[in-house]
């Protein structure tokens, strides 16, 4: 049987990748020029989160596979477990959101990153259900709840009113680069050691491929701590370009742990009070109706992180590059096409954009 040579296509592929690399450098350079008035902390926090999102991306694509292959959960049980975990950190975000103001950006980043490193250690070390639940998934949920709101606050403090959108766009770009790197690493390790192979780790012994992938996510979590460590805390960039040093908040207890617990307690109480007040306004229920309509679309997007790895392996076979198909392709499209789509649709209403985007996602 003869095969048609596709070697002729390689030069075109190289040109496309070369052009994409140049375009990416151009985008980041434009961000740098636009944010030249911002303190160096905006780059430190963004770079630290690139490593965090790389590790998080690797972890997300591995968890359901690992829960079934190593921990012993069925497909349905693994899916239900991940759904419950997602719900838990979503609720926790409500309580810890105000910690940034009470504790400070740097301290919250340190706490969240330490919890992420701690949890990922137990995710690859143990396969016992209760150990990975209590020492792995619980602190990981708290870590996500800590890190999610702090980024928004940090970017707001490190940019001026006229550059805040640019700051968020830069972070969104770097975040997707992190996700893409995670997909590449996920596939690369599986290609080397096999879908269900074993890897010998010095001092730790032999582990499965999926546990080794989680071990890699654990190691990638460390570099971000360096950039967080050299950040200045309690700084705020004013619109006139002056960098203000914010006064430290008065502690609510004798030590930081007591202070954090009291702040979380107050946060949940305040959130409940705000919800009661907002629920009396008709606009709130219109907004909730919009969210309910879009819930299915968003659910499919998040569901892909946990369902597609198993689906891809079963349909395409062991070793299929499922990380490249979804973990890389999706963020790369976002990085390169969001600026273009934003420019082409700059005169469209938000409602029109949401409607068309949801229809495309649902299709």
Please name every model-derived segment.
Residues 11-21, 207-230:
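Symmetry-related core transmembrane helices of the 12-TM Major Facilitator Superfamily/SLC fold
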Residues 59-77, 303-324:
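Short amphipathic helix-loop junctions that connect adjacent transmembrane helices
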């Amino acid at each position: 049987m003869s095969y048609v040579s596709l070697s002729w296509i390689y030069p075109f592929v190289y040109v496309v990748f070369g052009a994409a690399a140049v375009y990416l450098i151009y985008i980041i350079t434009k961000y740098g020029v636009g944010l030249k008035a911002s303190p160096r902390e905006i780059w430190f926090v963004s770079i630290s989160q690139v490593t965090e999102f790389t590790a998080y991306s690797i972890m997300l694509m591995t968890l359901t596979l690992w829960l079934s292959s190593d921990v012993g959960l069925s497909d349905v049980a693994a899916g239900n477990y991940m759904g419950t975990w997602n719900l838990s950190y979503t609720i926790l975000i409500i309580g810890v959101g105000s910690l940034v103001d009470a504790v400070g950006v740097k301290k919250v980043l340190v706490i969240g990153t330490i919890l992420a490193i701690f949890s990922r250690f137990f995710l690859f070390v143990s396969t016992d259900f209760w150990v990975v639940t209590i020492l792995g998934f619980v602190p990981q949920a708290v870590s996500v709840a800590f890190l999610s709101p702090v980024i928004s606050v940090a970017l707001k403090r490190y940019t001026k009113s006229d550059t805040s959108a640019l700051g968020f766009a830069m972070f969104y770009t770097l975040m997707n680069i992190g996700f893409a790197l995670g997909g590449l690493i996920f596939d690369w390790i599986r290609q080397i050691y096999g879908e269900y192979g074993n890897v010998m780790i010095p001092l730790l012994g032999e582990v499965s491929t999926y546990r080794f992938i989680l071990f890699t996510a654990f190691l990638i979590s460390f570099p971000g701590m360096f950039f967080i460590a050299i950040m200045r805390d309690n700084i705020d960039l004013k619109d006139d370009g002056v960098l203000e040093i914010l006064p430290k908040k008065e502690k609510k207890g004798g030590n930081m742990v007591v202070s954090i617990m009291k702040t979380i307690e107050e946060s949940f109480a305040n959130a409940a009070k705000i919800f009661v007040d907002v629920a009396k306004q008709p606009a709130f229920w219109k907004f909730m109706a919009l969210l309910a309509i879009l819930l299915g679309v968003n659910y499919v997007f998040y569901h892909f992180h946990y369902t597609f790895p198993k689906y891809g392996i079963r349909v395409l076979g062991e070793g299929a590059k499922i990380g490249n198909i979804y973990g890389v392709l999706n963020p790369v499209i976002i990085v390169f096409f969001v600026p273009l789509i934003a420019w082409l649709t700059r005169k469209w209403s938000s409602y029109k954009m949401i409607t068309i985007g949801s229809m495309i996602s649902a299709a």
